[in-house]
């Protein structure tokens, strides 16, 4: 195990052990025990400085809200928009396309990446469509009320003083399509969260999207065929 070990790892105590351990004397709890425990837990202190950034709230409605811009999300948003629906397409990551950016697929005689770019370009040109990247839909409430967090300018080197840093959207949608994709199921073993261990989907994204090689001599462990298309790429 190469992980840096914290205080809890050293003493290997179960969670909440201090509630039964530091019982006596009672007067020590607030002055000695609790301050020590909170310091050991690494709890931070909230800043008292004024935040100079701008933040906005926005209220919007739509016929269809699509979360995720993979193949199913793009196809759904495009079909609805072509039929005149007011559509909002939300993508959490900076780039649209989802698995189309990493998988070798072909749609309408185009590569997945080129097809995604074509659809996004068309969607952006439609007056009834709002396309947002760096935007995470994190709340789904009664009567199709959804809340979306947009990172507006954190990635910009230069920006106007009137440009908000972040924007919180309150969206009332008639219909919602959750096209957030699926998460690759990991193989569970001890310390499988240490640096240098990747899911195949993550390894492909590093290579295809960011141009980063995860290793020169990788060991690939898989129980299903999903690693077959990944192996030659690595």
What is each PLM-predicted segment?
Residues 3-67, 113, 120-217:
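FAD-binding core/adjacent interface of flavoenzyme oxidoreductases
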Residues 62-128, 136, 187, 205-209, ...:
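Beta1-alpha1 glycine-rich phosphate/pyrophosphate-binding loop at the start
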Residues 1-7, 11, 224-234:
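Single conserved hydrophobic/aromatic residue that forms the stacking wall/gate
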């Amino acid at each position: 195990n190469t992980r840096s070990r914290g205080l809890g790892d050293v003493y290997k105590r179960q969670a909440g052990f201090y509630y039964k351990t530091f019982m006596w004397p009672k007067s020590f709890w607030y002055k000695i025990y609790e301050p020590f425990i909170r310091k050991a837990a690494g709890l931070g202190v909230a800043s008292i400085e004024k935040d100079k950034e701008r933040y906005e709230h926005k209220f919007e409605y739509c016929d269809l809200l699509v979360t995720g811009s993979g193949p199913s999300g793009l196809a759904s948003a495009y079909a609805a928009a072509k039929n005149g629906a007011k559509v909002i397409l939300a993508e959490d990551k900076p780039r649209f396309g989802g698995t189309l950016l990493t998988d070798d697929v072909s749609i309408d005689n185009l590569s997945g990446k080129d097809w995604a770019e074509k659809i996004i370009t068309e969607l952006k040109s439609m007056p009834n469509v709002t396309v947002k990247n760096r935007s995470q839909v994190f709340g789904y409430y009664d009567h199709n009320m959804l809340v979306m967090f947009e990172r507006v300018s954190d990635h910009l080197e230069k920006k106007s003083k009137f440009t908000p840093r972040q924007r919180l959207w309150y969206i009332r949608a008639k219909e919602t399509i959750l096209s957030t994709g699926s998460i690759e199921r990991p193989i569970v073993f001890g310390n499988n969260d240490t640096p240098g261990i990747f899911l195949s989907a993550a390894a492909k994204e590093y290579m295809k999207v960011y141009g980063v090689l995860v290793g020169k001599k990788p060991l690939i462990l898989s129980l299903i065929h999903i690693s077959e298309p990944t192996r030659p790429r690595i």
